[in-house]
């Protein structure tokens, strides 16, 4: 048995996609946990498994992780700030000049200012009483997510000033029936993801997938250390780099020799950046046709496939309905032929993470491939973990102000 049950609050960057990533990652790592609350902007998890904090380091779809060994409260009248801060901050209270701040997330916008004022004033007095009499408060700013309002401190500032032991950010979740308070101990490493995007030798921000999204997709595959991940449209290797970063075995294929050269160059750079020693036989990256995967691999031999075929032209402006339809129709056969080939080489119960485009047209319509109609025909089904049975595919990433969105599917072979 483990020492104690801890409560973890994760602030999400992609709502549905982030929650799905967390569930699949924890299930894949055989972590025992319970979801006690979730919303568009956060998820609250209880666990006594010490491995869970390492699992959180693998995620791409979060901003912050906080934890608490304290109980939630029904309302602010139940708040005992001295006891709460003593339990959360411990030895940090020995620092008279403690730098701290509050980030408050709520389903009810009208409660934000009242909660902020009440907790800020009570915590200031409690910190003085507990010995941090020269503490400094970092102010939060208003933000709005879909369905969630917040007074928050940006994760970059938390990373720079408010992580233990020198600082303390306290996360307050005002949920439907309870108020949860926890201390942030980890933020997403924005700089590292940015470096992986812009410092590598070859990148194209106009069409390449952001490394954070690639990390999420790798996690959605549910891959384990003994398995192999294939990207049959690998391009310059964005997805492959994230899989390598998590120490997974990878295979990359692209029909363009120039893209394979770029992918190999990026991987060599990444091995030096991350100080990873790659054997001469790994990774396996070669020129090949994604529509003929059975020419390179045995049937039922690949564990996981994660890919984003980029077959549409770069859209400089919104197309007409007619032009959008033509573009989709022109590339549809390649998508479906490749998907059919993927199914042949994929192991039973193996998973395909497929990204397909959705185009916004001049008159505001959104047009995409009829992928759903082919899934069952090819012997696939939408993958829904036990704790996410109500999820709806595709999961859309991006906003409608963009000319093209990403539709994400998590599919499993029967």
Model regions: which residues?
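Phosphate-coordination loops involved in phosphoryl transfer and adenosine-cofactor binding
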Residues: 96-99, 226
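Active-site nucleophile-His-acid catalytic modules used for acyl/amide transfer and hydrolysis
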Residues: 102-106
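Class I S-adenosyl-L-methionine-dependent methyltransferase catalytic core
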Residues: 2-79, 83, 87, 108-117, ...
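A gly/proline- and charged-residue-enriched helix-loop-helix capping module
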Residues: 124-148
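Short glycine-rich phosphate-binding loop at a beta-alpha junction
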Residues: 101, 127, 136, 307, ...
């Amino acid at each position: 048995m483990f020492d104690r049950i801890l409560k973890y609050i994760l602030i999400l960057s992609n709502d549905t996609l982030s929650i799905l990533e967390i569930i699949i990652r924890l299930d894949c790592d055989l972590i025992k946990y319970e979801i006690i609350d979730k919303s568009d902007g956060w998820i609250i998890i209880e666990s006594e498994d010490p491995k869970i904090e390492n699992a959180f380091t693998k995620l791409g779809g979060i901003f912050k992780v906080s934890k608490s060994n304290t109980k939630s409260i029904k309302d602010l009248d139940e708040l005992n700030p001295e006891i709460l801060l003593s339990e959360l901050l411990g030895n940090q209270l020995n620092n008279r000049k403690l730098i701290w701040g509050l980030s408050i997330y709520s389903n009810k916008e009208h409660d934000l200012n009242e909660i902020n004022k009440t907790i800020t004033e009570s915590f200031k007095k409690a910190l003085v009483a507990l010995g941090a009499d020269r503490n400094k408060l970092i102010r939060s700013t208003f933000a709005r997510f879909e369905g969630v309002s917040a007074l928050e401190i940006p994760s970059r500032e938390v990373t720079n000033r408010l992580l233990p032991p020198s600082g303390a950010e306290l996360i307050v979740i005002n949920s439907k029936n309870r108020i949860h308070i926890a201390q942030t101990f980890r933020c997403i490493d924005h700089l590292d993801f940015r470096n992986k995007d812009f410092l590598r030798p070859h990148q194209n921000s106009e069409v390449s997938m952001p490394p954070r999204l690639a990390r999420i997709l790798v996690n959605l595959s549910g891959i384990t250390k003994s398995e192999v991940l294939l990207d049959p449209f690998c391009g310059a290797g964005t997805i492959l780099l994230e899989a390598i970063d998590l120490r997974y075995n990878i295979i990359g294929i692209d029909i363009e020799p120039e893209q394979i050269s770029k992918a190999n160059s990026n991987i060599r750079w990444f091995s030096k950046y991350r100080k990873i020693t790659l054997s001469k036989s790994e990774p396996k990256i070669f020129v090949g046709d994604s529509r003929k995967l059975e020419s390179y691999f045995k049937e039922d031999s690949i564990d996981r496939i994660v890919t984003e075929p980029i077959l549409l032209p770069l859209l400089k402006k919104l197309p007409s309905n007619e032009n959008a339809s033509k573009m989709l129709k022109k590339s549809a056969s390649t998508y479906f032929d490749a998907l059919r080939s993927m199914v042949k080489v994929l192991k039973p119960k193996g998973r395909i993470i497929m990204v397909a485009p959705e185009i916004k047209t001049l008159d505001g319509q959104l047009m995409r491939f009829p992928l759903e109609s082919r899934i069952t025909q090819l012997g696939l089904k939408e993958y829904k973990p036990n704790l996410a049975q109500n999820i709806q595919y595709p999961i859309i990433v991006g906003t409608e102000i963009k000319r093209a969105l990403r539709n994400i599917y998590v599919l499993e072979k029967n």
